[in-house]
Design a protein with these regions (language model features):
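Positively charged n-region of N-terminal signal peptides that target proteins for export
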Residues: 1-6
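Short, low-complexity N-terminal intrinsically disordered segments enriched in polar/charged residues
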Residues: 20-46
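Short solvent-exposed beta->alpha transition segments
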Residues: 31-35, 39, 49-96
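Exposed beta-sheet edge and beta->alpha loop/turn motif
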Residues: 91-141
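Bacterial N-terminal signal peptides
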Residues: 10-21
Length: 141
């Protein structure tokens, strides 16, 4: 079971959200966004690629076509998301009308990874529209 650090992350999000000038709506959506990402990671941990695929945006679903192909891509390209040891939510950022959730993941070997989840809101709620691996801060290990 992975450890989520919501209390520390919530304080950080509150402070960073105010500092980054997030709108009240964006700040309110932060918890919903974190819930979607957490649910997808839980699905990967359970090898439930169908549930994980459901959290992907229609664009991502069109690109990969099937839950199985999507799961293979994540397993091979984002192993730290497939089997994280620890997940910590960092800041939520609003840029160009889009919301991005930064997430720090510790992999099974103890290495830290910073991922930026691009989120899109649709009729059925928030979906993950892409994930980008960012370089961690110097000395973060």
């Amino acid at each position: 079971m992975i450890r989520f650090r919501p209390a520390i992350a919530a304080l950080f999000l509150l402070v960073s959200g105010v500092a980054l000038g997030l709108t009240p709506a964006a700040r309110a959506d932060s918890q919903s966004i974190r819930d979607v990402i957490s649910s997808q990671i839980d699905a990967f941990l359970a090898d439930d690629v169908v549930a994980a695929f459901d959290h992907a945006s229609p664009t991502i679903q069109r690109i990969f076509g099937t839950p199985e192909r999507f799961g293979e891509m994540v397993q091979q390209g984002y192993p730290m998301v497939w089997r994280p040891a620890e997940v910590t939510f960092l800041s939520t950022e609003e840029r160009g009308g889009r919301l991005f959730q930064n997430v720090m993941v510790r992999d099974a070997d103890g290495a830290l990874h910073i991922l930026e989840y691009e989120m899109i809101e649709g009729a059925s709620g928030w979906k993950i529209d892409g994930v980008r691996l960012r370089a961690p801060a110097a000395g973060a290990a």
